[in-house]
């Protein structure tokens, strides 16, 4: 589960880099949306991964 958290974080950082720096140009809005979607997915996977297994 930690692997997926790291993957979500890296994807969010890349999407944010392209969206906020302006490299993507037209896709800036999409990159911002993807940044927040993957950032939320990262936080959720961190919380779920910390639960004790029953």
Curated annotation (Swiss-Prot):
Keyword field contains Transmembrane helix: yes
Organism: Saccharophagus degradans (strain 2-40 / ATCC 43961 / DSM 17024)
Family to which the UniProt record says this protein belongs: Belongs to the UPF0391 family.
Designated name of the protein: UPF0391 membrane protein Sde_0270
One annotated Gene Ontology cellular component of this protein: plasma membrane
Membrane-spanning parts: 6-26, 29-49
Main location group: membrane
Keywords: Cell membrane, Membrane, Transmembrane, Transmembrane helix
Annotated membrane topology: Multi-pass membrane protein
Compartments (UniProt record): Cell membrane
The keyword Transmembrane is annotated on this UniProt entry: yes
Coiled-coil positions: none
């Amino acid at each position: 589960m930690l692997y997926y958290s790291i993957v979500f974080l890296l994807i969010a950082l890349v999407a944010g880099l392209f969206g906020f720096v302006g490299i993507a140009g037209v896709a800036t809005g999409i990159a911002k949306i993807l940044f927040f979607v993957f950032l939320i997915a990262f936080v959720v996977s961190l919380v779920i991964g910390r639960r004790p297994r029953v």
